[in-house]
Amino acid sequence: MSSHGNSLFLRESGQRLGRVGWLQRLQESLQQRALRTRLRLQTMTREHVLRFLRRNAFILLTVSAVVIGVSLAFALRPYQLTYRQIKYFSFPGELLMRMLQMLVLPLIVSSLVTGMASLDNKATGRMGMRAAVYYMVTTVIAVFIGILMVTIIHPGKGSKEGLHREGRIETIPTADAFMDLVRNMFPPNLVEACFKQFKTQYSTRLVTRTIVRTENGSELGTSMPPPSSMDNGTSLLENVTWALGTLQEVLSFEETVPVPGSANGINALGLVVFSVAFGLVIGGVKHKGRVLRDFFDSLNEAIMRMVGIIIWYAPVGILFLIAGKILEMEDMAVLGGQLGMYTLTVIVGLFLHAGGVLPLIYFLITHRNPFPFIGGVLQALITAMGTSSSSATLPITFRCLEEGLGVDRRITRFVLPVGATVNMDGTALYEALAAIFIAQVNNYELNLGQITTISITATAASVGAAGIPQAGLVTMVIVLTSVGLPTEDITLIIAVDWFLDRLRTMTNVLGDSIGAAVIEHLSQRELELQEAELTLPSLGKPYKPLMAQEKGASRGRGGNESAM
């Protein structure tokens, strides 16, 4: 008995000492960091300042562009510019969007093909499974945060009569929307997939139906006479009697039928599916696919060189994009009342997910400080805020992760294009939150089953968003239809969607970036084995470009991201 008591006492003492030791180590680490910062400030010279400015020129210019753009927009609002004048003013920003969108298509295809071809099937399968688990977990958490925030804050309290409606929403049946998603995964024409997506359209046709009624009002449904008897005279008499005792009624009505159609825009989902399959096949044929492998690798390098040129224009474009959007707002007063509370709820939810959940996942898996990493992708985040498209931000995200943070290119070339297409944490959070907000303004009480339906539908619908601007409004129709909420009430939140769209795009891009770092950390063993195999003399040459990493950037990331 005494030995058992002593063991319990020793175990509790050990746990207490462990907790004290952890706190002490954390305190010592913070003190050492503060001391290093103090020494760095004391020994700072003009040369150090210039080196810092050169190293962070992109980020400083981009942040300055955002501040100047917002200030310039509010300074010009009193002049009440016309729509044409605002479009002229926003023209430099439109040029940036067109430049980035020009690079999206070749970048997605070349990066996915080279990334898949550089890994064997077993390593690709494991990486794909980890990416799928990460995407699903973060999306489900985002939906849960959105539901929790809108339930706690309850921004829809009151009547919707005071809310301003704006725009029109096309109603799309849920089944047709999901079938379009699957259809777009397998485009019949790859050339057409570069500029068009399949989208179900609807037409009406006139249907005529003849209804036969008897004297007592019963419906026979057809105008055929009763069967004839053996006696011709009796048969004729019965037919005359039947005709006199019946009434034919012709009904005509219009029926809405689905027909094949299309919508302008890159079919990113179909190109991703094809590129992944094509890259796996090239990797499987080994030496026979060397020419194709080298071609797509050279194409990817050329595209990244073009990104390096365009990136210097990004601050100018972002300045005019943000300023133009603020100038387009007709009335800033729409941000008050219920809509203001709704906007605040979305911002809080996105902040909790992007500033809390995603960094926590990064820290728990990699055991590194997540905030230097987030600082490394800051330019991609600001670009996402300006363009409101995770696909258009993809070239900048590649540059930040590969050249700035030294993430393995075999990981980024697989994770980033797929993530920009299907991993939409911010969109999923927004859709779940907005659906419950619309239920609240209609005084509609949702039960647990309906909230669960919203969660599942928002998670699935976010996959089909495909990184296009304001896709959340389109997929929102699916979520509302699943629980019978009025889809026309989406017009209540359109007035602030341009702003919230930028914030959720930033969340999407951050989720993709952290996902790439997490999957790289979990795939270290496969990457090292693959590198050892590919450095053999018989296989070395074709794969060397893929294994060339930015050593300086990698060392910078290792020095900055020290464990907390």
From Swiss-Prot:
Name its GO BP terms in alphabetical order: L-aspartate import across plasma membrane; L-glutamate import across plasma membrane; L-glutamate transmembrane transport
Note the SUPFAM superfamilies from the entry. Answer: Proton glutamate symport protein
**UniProt topology in membrane:** Multi-pass membrane protein
Residue ranges of the TM segments: 56-76, 99-119, 133-153, 262-285, 295-322, 344-365, 411-437, 498-519
Q: Does the keyword Glycoprotein apply?
A: yes
Reaction(s) catalyzed by this protein?
Answer: K(+)(in) + L-glutamate(out) + 3 Na(+)(out) + H(+)(out) = K(+)(out) + L-glutamate(in) + 3 Na(+)(in) + H(+)(in); K(+)(in) + L-aspartate(out) + 3 Na(+)(out) + H(+)(out) = K(+)(out) + L-aspartate(in) + 3 Na(+)(in) + H(+)(in); D-aspartate(out) + K(+)(in) + 3 Na(+)(out) + H(+)(out) = D-aspartate(in) + K(+)(out) + 3 Na(+)(in) + H(+)(in)
Per UniProt, where does Na(+) 1 bind?
G419, N423, N508, D512
According to the record, glycans are attached at N216, N232, N239
Q: Does the keyword Phosphoprotein apply?
A: yes
Describe tissue expression.
Detected in brain, cerebellum and hippocampus.
Q: Keywords on this record?
A: Amino-acid transport, Cell membrane, Chloride, Glycoprotein, Membrane, Metal-binding, Phosphoprotein, Potassium, Sodium, Symport, Transmembrane, Transmembrane helix, Transport
Which of this chain's residues are annotated to bind L-aspartate?
A: S388, S389, S390, T427, I468, P469, Q470, A471, G472, D501, N508
The compartments listed are: Cell membrane
- Any Gene Ontology CC annotation: plasma membrane
Q: Which InterPro entries match?
A: DAACS (IPR050746), Na-dicarboxylate_symporter (IPR001991), Na-dicarboxylate_symporter_CS (IPR018107), Na:dicarbo_symporter_sf (IPR036458)
Q: Which residues carry this modification: Phosphoserine?
A: S2
**What domain of life?**
Eukaryota
Any one Gene Ontology MF annotation carried by this entry is:
glutamate:sodium symporter activity
The entry's free-text remark on domains says: Contains eight transmembrane regions plus two helical hairpins that dip into the membrane. These helical hairpin structures play an important role in the transport process. The first enters the membrane from the cytoplasmic side, the second one from the extracellular side. During the transport cycle, the regions involved in amino acid transport, and especially the helical hairpins, move vertically by about 15-18 Angstroms, alternating between exposure to the aqueous phase and reinsertion in the lipid bilayer. In contrast, the regions involved in trimerization do not move.
PANTHER family linked to this entry: EXCITATORY AMINO ACID TRANSPORTER 4, SODIUM/DICARBOXYLATE SYMPORTER-RELATED
Q: Which family does it belong to?
A: Belongs to the dicarboxylate/amino acid:cation symporter (DAACS) (TC 2.A.23) family. SLC1A6 subfamily.
Q: What is this protein called?
A: Excitatory amino acid transporter 4
From which organism does this entry originate?
Answer: Canis lupus familiaris
Chain's gene name: SLC1A6
